[in-house]
Amino acid sequence: MKIVIQRVMKASLTVNGKSRASINQGLVLLVGIGPDDVQEDLTYAVRKITNMRIFSDEEGKMNLSVRDIKGEVLSVSQFTLFANTKKGNRPAFTGAAQADLASYLYDQFNQELAQFVPVQTGIFGSDMQVSLTNDGPVTILLDTKNKE
């Protein structure tokens, strides 16, 4: 899994011009599923995301997690995180998981995440518009295949 984690003040998502989801302070997650991803990747990612101390405490130090601040999460499926740009000018997305596996694992990821924080989602495979107000900005890339 490759996940872009963005700390936000607020975010919203629309599909086909209709509002689908919105959150206040919390995290926007752009979630890419790879062909070799398994349940252990989901569990690892959920643990990291929900406990990552990237929100400021009363002294201005990044010392609080999204759980600590009672924040929310907007989770957006993002197969383009597996783009291969080595050849030519058009990215290839063959490094992403097939849609059926990716959809299943994305749903499982969101269900597991929702055990710890409120989660809003987009619609898997849809063309979506995401609006957000970055906070910091703080943007982190989590790759479950690179745990060292």
Swiss-Prot record:
Subunit structure: Homodimer.
Family: Belongs to the DTD family.
Domains: entry comment: A Gly-cisPro motif from one monomer fits into the active site of the other monomer to allow specific chiral rejection of L-amino acids.
Keyword Mitochondrion (UniProt): no
Function: An aminoacyl-tRNA editing enzyme that deacylates mischarged D-aminoacyl-tRNAs. Also deacylates mischarged glycyl-tRNA(Ala), protecting cells against glycine mischarging by AlaRS. Acts via tRNA-based rather than protein-based catalysis; rejects L-amino acids rather than detecting D-amino acids in the active site. By recycling D-aminoacyl-tRNA to D-amino acids and free tRNA molecules, this enzyme counteracts the toxicity associated with the formation of D-aminoacyl-tRNA entities in vivo and helps enforce protein L-homochirality.
Cited HAMAP family: Deacylase_Dtd
Catalytic EC class: hydrolase
Gene3D superfamilies membership: D-tyrosyl-tRNA(Tyr) deacylase
Species this protein is from: Streptococcus mutans serotype c (strain ATCC 700610 / UA159)
Position of sequence motif Gly-cisPro motif, important for rejection of L-amino acids: 136-137
Keywords: Cytoplasm, Hydrolase, RNA-binding, tRNA-binding
GO molecular function terms listed in the Swiss-Prot or TrEMBL record: D-tyrosyl-tRNA(Tyr) deacylase activity; Gly-tRNA(Ala) deacylase activity; Ser(Gly)-tRNA(Ala) hydrolase activity; tRNA binding
PANTHER family: D-AMINOACYL-TRNA DEACYLASE 1, D-TYROSYL-TRNA TYR DEACYLASE
Reactions accelerated catalytically: glycyl-tRNA(Ala) + H2O = tRNA(Ala) + glycine + H(+); a D-aminoacyl-tRNA + H2O = a tRNA + a D-alpha-amino acid + H(+)
Its EC number(s): 3.1.1.96
GO BP: D-amino acid catabolic process
One Pfam family matching this protein: Tyr_Deacylase
Name of the protein described by the UniProt record: D-aminoacyl-tRNA deacylase
